[in-house]
Amino acid sequence: MQITARYYGFFSRVTGKLYEALEVGDELAVKGLIEVLERSYGYKFSRLCFIRPLYSDREYLNICLNFQDLNSLQKFPMGLDTRLKEGDLVSFGVMGGAA
């Protein structure tokens, strides 16, 4: 299946791209996509997927799926195990970072 990955801020610096179309397996979850992209762009890519604000003791995902914040347990109760579908748009780096 085909999905689109959109890169903002530091993600675009790490990848050298603003977006790309990706052909991925039918059963791929968000966690698997991070692993695929880490193999292409290195460990720094996967570390950027998680942010920890100074005021918090927990990490947050720096990822949106179809313009929806993946941190929302109401919309995405499976979190990183949320399965991707044909045509999905996965955005990296929409929170924080530099343009």
Where are these regions (language model features)?
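Ubiquitin-like/PB1-type beta-grasp interaction modules and other compact soluble beta-rich domains
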Residues: M1-A99
